[in-house]
Amino acid sequence: MYDMTKLKTRYFDIRLKNGKILNLEPPKLKVLRKIASLSEVKTSGELTENDIKNLTEAVSLSLSKNKQNYKITSENVEENYDIDEMVDFMENYFDWVNSIQNSKN
């Protein structure tokens, strides 16, 4: 019998700007779809207020799914991280999600 409770959870370790270390858990598919949708940033033209709001929410959702149960609000992200940091984080986060999706347990 296949036992889903035996799957080993993989974590994405990250150090926040405040020095706190988090072990991010893989997102559930529903949350992953939402994060992917929210994090789509225009590659040409200017960012709109809505683009920035969506990216900030995507980063907040991604960072808040962690082993430590440490919640990070969109306001916290907006106050402490710039656009380059948010985009860089999302690129690395999706690279990690793709790597665990493509590897065996």
What is each PLM-predicted segment?
Residues 1-13:
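Short acidic, Pro/Gly- and aromatic-enriched capping/linker segments at domain boundaries
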Residues 17-19:
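Glycine-centered tight beta-turn/hairpin loop motif at sheet-sheet or coil-to-beta transitions
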